[in-house]
Amino acid sequence: MTVYRKNISINVGETFSEDLTLLSADGSGVVNLTGFTAQSKIRKSPQNYRFADVQVGIVNPTQGQINISIASSITKFFQGGRHVYDIILTRPSGFKFVAVEGNALVRSGINTFVHYFGSP
């Protein structure tokens, strides 16, 4: 399986969730994820030591479907800008490999950091 490239967009302070279907390298079908486990992290840059865990659920293993999500309680601490993430799959044998990687555009809106100075 080759590394699948998928860019995502995340809004600061909102719950992020996206479903992905992993296809075989030759495009002949989906990857059977039965018995696999997955993990994911997002960082400001590949060299940055600070990261946030991304939840990965294998939704339908025989159809290669996974879900990645980040709770709003975590995204509220993100800084706007470009970040990077990847998803590492572990085969039942213990062999680990990067299955998905990409950029994450983190958008901070006008309501992200609200300061109240009296009544509106």
For every predicted segment, state its role.
Residues 1-120:
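Contiguous segments within soluble domain cores/interaction surfaces
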